[in-house]
């Protein structure tokens, strides 16, 4: 006997037995009511494997389940009705949890990791037939999709990344879903109409206590108590986006089967905010995201492993972040920031991302590896300050490399399950100690570079001008080619409260950087450069005073094979340069508001006093950027190693200039060495005090300034005052010490020319405004 008909008959019989006639009094109380109400209860579902297969390759989700978040049974209620020609659906459900035990790719022994998501789903939909054409498709009006009370756990090698307090509300009005003819065939097209997306992230934290606290995994209501840092957060995010345009999805990837997503999105009058103690806020965020060829998603395999590829031949991102605030919302504003980024394939320079299971090979079998390639051409970034704009014009960048993402734990606090040990900070040597507690981003063979044509002030087609040299103090070069290896590991919680802490190692090699360069590529170049940088126990916070970056313990070595004047490759060499730095407690602070009103070329707190001193009073408005850099240089108290009489300690402040080398070989020429430089507070009662440091305070504005043209001894003022890139700077320190000044001969060794050099109580102010020469 076939069991299905028998089971169906039994179900019908049970429903018939449950039916009974209503008497007259009961019938009289029944009123007409349309619609359907469905109430369901379920113990959830599970699947041992869910696979997506493409061109014979598979992405597999192992041990997938969706169950009640509390208890054993989940419930939901759905109400369906038809009013005014629309199908109206209201849906609500009890909290649930979705779990995926492993995310794998066929052909790889590694894994992307596992995840769990606690969530509550709700919806109010108003649907009717007829898409944008009014003939076929679906129209969506006055509808809302909500995902609330979300806590997301991502597990990598036994450690957890936790996203808390997550909620999304999507509002759809005048939206359509159609099947249309696209450039590659039939496409499913979602026209967003008047859409709004409201999202909140309450916090992002890490749980680095390996595995589960008991046989039962941690939940939002019963967190893992073993990691004391698990309660700290990277900060909060809020967004309120008004969206328009369309999103199309078609079959077929870059080759063979796959998926092609074609965005044509508009963002208008939106808000984006990050919150720590202070805030980073864009009060009027707008822009577009478009790709004519679309983004393709493919599954593929090469000699390395299986991977999922996201690629795009073209992508244009245009955005304006208006009303930018850094720090306290009642403070001055920065102005607005606009970006115009154009990604486009150009021969071997392509745009793609290959995602592979497993992270850094020294961080376990789980995690994420991404091979990357990018090419961005003819782009720009602009800053508007009190209505005056400045463009970083002709921005170009391209490169390739590999990124890894892992959750790791150091053995510094004692050997525990899953920790990694090391004793070496040099990445080129064994036992590298670059494994720390936190979320680790690894950088491997990132070969790339960037350049931009120069500054334009006033309009996007204004003449190119200088001024980029003023940014070198913040190590922003006008042009830079490099090969980068290293890592940065992040922990939630800053120096206080929310924010982040970090440990990092970066090695730039085979690099070439411009200090100053003109439109022909001629200038002052750092050629054949190696830059080795290390950060320990640093932090980043957003306070009411702005963004505060603390470098913690920092040491670096910049070695320039040739300081060239002219062409980057063939210009005249001024010699070899080595700069070592060892700092403790250095900081960088960025805040809203520039110089405001100030006296240029004189002194005085108001216009009258300024004019009386021979100066010129300028009011640069309440917007702009202020930057404060403090470098605390630490004295090396013992020489651990030497070469030809010169100290070679890794953590030491030292400047070496070498000329007259034999065939350009380091160490074969004559050297001038400024050795063991350090700062001091210059306090006789506490000679070891060193907190004041070497300070550079910069106010950056886009503002008009007075310019005159030299005509045979007279200077004719330019009318009106032209706009320029204005920098008001102040350099100040209490004391700088240099242990010794050495002259070094390649065969005769080092001779100390001076001992115990001191420079005290310097306070130098300057005002520079760069305008076009023509």
What are these regions (language model features)?
Residues 1-11:
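Sec-dependent signal peptide recognition
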Residues 13-16:
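N-terminal signal peptide c-region/cleavage motif recognized by signal peptidases
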